[in-house]
Amino acid sequence: MKSVEIERSGVLADSEKAYFGGAYSFWERIKMSGVGSSKIVYLNGIAAFDAMNDGIENEMNFVSFEIMKNGLILRLNRTQKLACVGVKITEIEKIKLTAYRIVVPDPGLNRKLTKIIHRGVLEITEYNGEVCSFSIFTQNFESLLKYFTKKEFSDKFEYSVSDAAPEKDFKFLLDLLERWP
């Protein structure tokens, strides 16, 4: 991943846009259903992002993606501190999304159902061996799955559902506390 120069507002410098093949036009972005992704949580693997870690607990590293004509831009926001890296599409070996099943209670029938594909882990592997990892919240999973199934990633994208036992959803405890007298 290459560190990318951005303005304070997060706009890419023209030289960086040119390096990654340029931005898509308005109509191209409309046809693609957008070029940006929803935010996910950065875990590890990118030196420029790891260097921003102040050691302050509970600070979340949110990352969003933007497709360029010949690259993928990753923008990190950590408590109003911004960083940006990019990688050319040709340098990406694979993009792997693993889904994890969650057991959630069905309020209507008062039983538990297994919901599939609710939480995920995303890994981007480059040909040079570098791997970066991200965690996907349940509310962003479907949109990220749709984002990486675009034709720009068709030969790089791998999707699987974990064979691990379904995880338990503890949201029912919050619901119970809300109904507590």
PLM regions and their residue ranges:
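Phosphoinositide-binding peripheral membrane targeting modules
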Residues: 56-108
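Short Pro/Gly-enriched beta-strand edge/turn motifs at strand-loop
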Residues: 43-49
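Acidic, Ser/Thr- and proline-rich intrinsically disordered linker/docking segments
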Residues: 1-43, 56, 93-181
